Amino acid sequence: VLDLRTYNSRFSSEEVQQSVIESDEFAYNMPIFFQDKKSYISKLEKNNPYLKVINIESKFPNTLSIKCMDREEVFAIKMSDERYFILDEDLKVLEVLTSFDSTQTNAILLGGEISVDNVDASAGDFLTLNAGQALIEAFVPAMKLNNRDVSEQKALFESINIRYRNNPITARSEAYLELYDFNGLKMCIFEAEDMLVNKINCLLAAHAAFDPKDAGTFELRILKDSNGDIFAHQMQKS
């Protein structure tokens, strides 16, 4: 008989943990080494949108150990006036809402030149973006490497837009991040696919020194000079 155990330091509730243990997806009458663990992970993720299954280990003679953790709300994408996807850093749909306003404790609104491939996704699915996916997926880890956890990221940024432009020096098309804080300050990280961790570090330092009352007059730009050095430029709005 299969003995199912869960190991997890960050379950949100005993109810969630119990629902995993009692899931009818598991083949309790099948030998341990014939269990389809990939299928279990897929089904658990779909049926429990806020759950992240890290791995499932087989332990002789009859134990499956499931290591899980909570997923955190990070991003929101507006699909229509009454349809918003709430996403984690892996772009998993945690919820579908009919309305959404970004605050310092909920998700950061994503926009700009991005489009969603699977527009009919529902809670538990993973989104695929037609453009900008790699950059969005790199943003949260880059922030964490700058010692900003998810709650701090949400407190800093109201919205993030993916934009494209022709680089004025190389004339090549490049992606950049256009970010807004809750004072309305516009911040741009140019050539965002290059040295993003360092550029975010520069942005955070410049933002900390910026006077919020100037948010309507200036914007911050994070650039790289011809020597490869990253710097912040405070530019007056036209």
Sequence positions of predicted segments:
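Acidic, glycine-rich low-complexity/disordered segments
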Residues: 1-19, 117
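Charged, solvent-exposed interaction patches on well-folded alpha/beta domains
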Residues: 1, 21-43, 52-238
